[in-house]
Design a protein with these regions (language model features):
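Glycine-/acidic-rich phosphate or pyrophosphate-binding loops and their flanking alpha/beta elements
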Residues: 6-10, 223-246, 259
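Glycine-rich beta-alpha junction loops
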Residues: 105-107, 167-174, 252-254, 305, ...
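Conformationally flexible catalytic loops at phosphate/diphosphate-handling active centers
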Residues: 160-238
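Generic long, charged, amphipathic alpha-helical segments
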Residues: 258-291
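Peripheral docking tails and interdomain loops at the edges
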Residues: 302-354
């Protein structure tokens, strides 16, 4: 069924299609419509909606639901996601699946309600304590807000891990037609869960191992999961990269601006391509490195002071120059402004290699 939806509403439609049965949350702009929509749709589809007293309460309730084998989720924006970090670390340490949606706003502190991508480090690098990672998927359309939420639930159960969907206020608030899937994804058996019967009485959900050797074993087991994710769960999209001399790397709303800029630049004879990471962790390192060997330079376009660019530089490993085009504080560049920078880069790069 095709519907005109806000990005935030599409998240909940995807969650329902994925078989999510529990939402715990605390409202915060620009993510509040997720809680509002969940409060209606989950009870209508056999689930529960519980408004928490805080974001700390939200993530701890989610820990409990996940321990019982329930597909559960929460959502917030940067200030609330910061408060959840302890609980997310506990979920990772206890190998509990669940989905956390971060609709980013400008920061640090209370910031403002403008569009920004400043939560990249917080989410992608793991803002909580200890040695853990979380898969992170970054949509760039309202359709993907729905589809990647479904995918996030599937990955969460496949690896028994918390998973993020990372978007921004523009994607959360914009409206686009969405094909909403009617068929629910298949939920796997969870023999490890604690459901209050004799069969699961001896199951233990914990992240505390006082013996040093046992804690090291846990971390080694987690690392094996992350290695498998890096082999199997990398997602990206390319646009006009086959003959590109300059490559743009961008995600989320920035990638839409970047694509428009690439189209304009191509029409003016500038050979530009776009790589859009869809999975921010695991990052498309291998493919980016391959493309870096074919282009003169790379532009990273992001709405932060420079966070994505660190992963790009790591992937490229000095093969080609990497430059940053950024806006912060809720400001966004136009496609035309990006084109002007791309023309400068092409002129400088081709001149250097002439």
């Amino acid at each position: 069924m095709r519907r005109l939806l806000k990005g935030n509403e599409a998240v909940v439609r995807g969650a329902v299609a994925a078989g999510c049965k529990a939402y715990f949350g605390y409202p915060i702009t620009p993510a509040s419509e997720i809680a509002e929509t969940a409060s209606v749709l989950l009870p209508e589809n056999g689930g529960i909606f519980i408004p928490a007293e805080s974001e700390i309460g939200s993530i701890q309730m989610m820990f409990g639901a996940a321990s019982a084998g329930v597909r559960a989720m929460t959502a917030s924006s940067g200030p609330g996601i910061s408060l959840m970090q302890e609980g997310i670390s506990y979920m990772a340490g206890a190998s509990l699946p669940g989905v956390i949606v971060d609709i980013m706003r400008a920061g640090p502190g209370l910031g403002n309600l403008g569009v920004e991508q400043g939560d990249y480090h917080l989410v992608v690098k793991g803002g909580g304590h200890g040695c853990y990672r979380t898969p992170v998927f970054a949509p760039n359309s309202v359709q993907e807000m729905c589809d990647l939420t479904i995918h996030a639930f599937e990955v969460a159960d496949r690896y028994r891990t918390p998973v993020y969907v990372l978007a921004d206020g523009a994607l959360g608030q914009m409206m686009e037609p969405v094909e909403v899937p009617q068929k629910k994804s298949v939920e796997p058996e969870k023999p490890w869960a604690v459901v209050g019967n004799a069969a699961t009485r001896k199951n233990l959900i914990t992240s505390i191992y006082l013996e040093h050797e046992r804690q090291e074993i846990l971390i080694t087991e987690l690392e094996k999961k992350y290695e498998e994710m890096e082999r199997s769960e990398v997602l990206w999209q390319e646009f006009l990269t086959e003959d590109a001399e300059v490559l743009v790397v961008a995600y989320g709303i920035s990638s839409r601006i970047a694509r428009a800029a690439v189209e304009i630049a191509r029409a003016e004879g500038v050979r530009v391509g776009l790589l859009r990471p869809i999975s921010l962790y695991p990052f498309p390192t291998k493919r980016l490195r391959q493309l870096a060997g074919k282009v003169y330079s790379i532009m990273v376009l992001e709405l932060s002071s420079g966070q994505l660019i660190e992963d790009v530089r790591l992937a490229v490993s000095g093969i080609t120059p990497v430059q940053l085009l950024r806006r912060t504080g809720g400001m966004m560049p136009t496609a035309e402004q990006v084109v002007q920078e791309l023309k400068k880069m092409e002129s400088e790069s081709v001149g250097n290699y002439a």
